């Protein structure tokens, strides 16, 4: 082998010339004590609140308590490999997550790392998880419908784009099913609707079983809805800081769409578990407990999260982020601490009841206790025209039904009211995974409030509805198209709709 001295000396001179003198300076501290997912660290004098710090082995944490002599750090992950005396390094960055369309169709953890085994996510942007909500000036009042595909909700408790509508109820009452159906209902718009109408969906699973989350993802995948959805999962086996962070991470991912003039929907399932995780962190950080041992700022925890859902005005891109937070109650107790907090923050609630669920009324929405504080401004005119009377009729029906239990001799008007109410209640039932388009809901409810169901036995209402829908999709397609494009029922359309339902009703008998 031929070694040339001149060549070697040239290489060495080049290496020496390019040798950098600047040392890499990073501020470090020492772990004083560690346990229960909390580390006390000495020496990080300039650390910021909410800053990400790094432990040996790549484990990350977030500085939450900045005290006189040490820093309380919550650890994202297991604290098993961290020991006293370990070096902790500042990263200089407040906790952030990747955002953008690259996340669609993926399942990520609270820090935005993929957990679905489909390879890395090459997101071009990152954003902080905890940012300030839009102020009053950039907002606009909610005026576009956010269709859930569920008759009971779209007709009676309409949700608009940019609204925060709480889904509240005991365990096993169908809270997650409402969010799932709402996500599935967006598929038709994503397949062949205009870009401006598309609704991108984020689903945050907090403290749930992994099997439940896997099932949710499987349903979305099978029905082609995962392509426009992001799943953020902090399951029951994840550390409390991850469960605390997941809703904020999901919200940031949804805000990307809101701020780029698009529409997004986020479901937090559920915020009771986030509050429990936050309580655990706060108590371990020795913050003083308040009511039900929750820290004093648990209201602020949820208010700053839910205030980020907003409808922006045209100068700011006219985007929106709609939130569907879920709260699980114990024994229908809506007056507990966390439920009352979230009810007071949101723009209405969908109240689900165990009794209704077991009576076979599903979705088990208690129409009397559920409200939407945005109301009919979140409905198209056609829906307002047909659903206006159904609310009053159902309210009267509930009132009468309570008295009718005691009296046997009822006058004809009361009997008529009870019959109509029973059929309307039956009409609002809907099987899971079968969301309806708005114009189809309008046709079905129109049949209900115009007396087409009154002669039918209650048991046949569901069959009539299914038959009517398939008839309208084939024979009455023109009427449905008119309702969809005009978004209102003119006298002409009304006559055509009546005729179509009439001709079906004759063949049904």
UniProtKB/Swiss-Prot annotation:
One of its GO terms (molecular function) is ATP binding. The record marks 370 as: Required for activity. GO terms for cellular component: plasma membrane; proton-transporting ATP synthase complex. Its main location: membrane. Its EC number is 7.1.2.2. Disulfide bonds: none annotated. Transmembrane segments: none annotated. SUPFAM superfamilies: C-terminal domain of alpha and beta subunits of F1 ATP synthase, N-terminal domain of alpha and beta subunits of F1 ATP synthase, P-loop containing nucleoside triphosphate hydrolases. It is a peripheral membrane protein. Signal peptide: none annotated. Keywords: ATP synthesis, ATP-binding, Cell inner membrane, Cell membrane, CF(1), Hydrogen ion transport, Ion transport, Membrane, Nucleotide-binding, Translocase, Transport. Belongs to the ATPase alpha/beta chains family. Produces ATP from ADP in the presence of a proton gradient across the membrane. The alpha chain is a regulatory subunit. PANTHER family: ATP SYNTHASE SUBUNIT ALPHA, MITOCHONDRIAL. This is ATP synthase subunit alpha. It comes from Sinorhizobium medicae (strain WSM419). The gene is atpA.
């Amino acid at each position: 082998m031929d070694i040339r001295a001149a060549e070697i000396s040239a290489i060495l001179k080049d290496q020496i010339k390019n040798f950098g003198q600047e040392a890499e300076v990073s501020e470090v501290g020492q772990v004083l004590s560690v346990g229960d997912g909390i580390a006390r660290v000495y020496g990080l004098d300039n650390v910021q609140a909410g800053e990400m710090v790094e432990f040996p082995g790549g484990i990350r944490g977030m500085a939450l308590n900045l005290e006189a002599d040490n820093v309380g750090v919550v650890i994202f992950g297991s604290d098993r490999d961290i020991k006293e005396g370990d070096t902790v390094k500042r990263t200089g960055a407040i906790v952030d997550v990747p955002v953008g369309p690259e996340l669609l169709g993926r399942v990520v953890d609270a820090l935005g790392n993929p957990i679905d085994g489909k390879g890395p996510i090459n997101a071009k942007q990152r954003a902080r998880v905890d940012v300030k909500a839009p102020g009053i000036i950039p907002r606009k009042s909610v005026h576009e419908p956010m269709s859930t595909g569920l008759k009971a909700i779209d007709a009676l408790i309409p949700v608009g784009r940019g609204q925060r509508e709480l889904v509240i109820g005991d365990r096993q009452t169908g809270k997650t099913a409402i969010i799932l159906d709402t996500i599935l209902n967006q598929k038709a718009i994503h397949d062949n609707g205009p870009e401006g109408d598309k609704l991108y969906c984020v689903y945050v699973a907090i403290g749930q079983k992994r099997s439940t989350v896997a099932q949710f993802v499987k349903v979305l995948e099978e029905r082609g809805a995962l392509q426009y959805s992001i799943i953020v999962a902090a399951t029951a086996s994840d550390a409390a800081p991850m469960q605390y962070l997941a809703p904020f991470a999901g919200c940031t991912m949804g805000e990307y769409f809101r701020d780029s003039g698009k529409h997004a929907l986020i479901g937090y399932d559920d915020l009771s578990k986030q509050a429990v995780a936050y309580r655990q962190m706060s108590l371990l950080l020795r913050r003083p407990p308040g009511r039900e041992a929750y820290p004093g700022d648990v209201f602020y925890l949820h208010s700053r999260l839910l205030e980020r859902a907003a409808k922006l005005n045209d100068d700011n891109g006219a985007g929106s982020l709609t939130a569907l937070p879920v709260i699980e109650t114990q024994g229908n107790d809506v007056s507990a601490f966390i439920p009352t907090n979230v009810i007071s923050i949101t723009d209405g609630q969908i109240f689900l009841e165990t009794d209704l669920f077991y009576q076979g009324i599903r979705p088990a929405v208690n129409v009397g206790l559920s409200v939407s504080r945005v109301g009919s401004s979140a409905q198209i005119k056609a829906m307002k025209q047909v659903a206006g009377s159904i609310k009053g009729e159902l309210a009267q029906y509930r009132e009468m039904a309570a008295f009718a239990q005691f009296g046997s001799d009822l006058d004809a008007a009361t009997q008529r009211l009870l019959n109509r109410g029973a059929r309307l209640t039956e009409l609002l039932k809907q099987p899971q995974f079968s969301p309806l388009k708005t114009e189809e809901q309008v046709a079905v409810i129109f049949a209900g409030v115009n007396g087409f169901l009154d002669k039918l036995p209650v048991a046949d209402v569901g069959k009539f509805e299914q038959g009517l829908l398939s008839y309208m999709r084939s024979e009455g397609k023109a009427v449905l198209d008119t309702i969809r494009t005009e978004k209102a029922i003119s006298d002409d359309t009304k006559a055509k709709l009546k005729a179509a339902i009439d001709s079906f009703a004759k063949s049904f008998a």
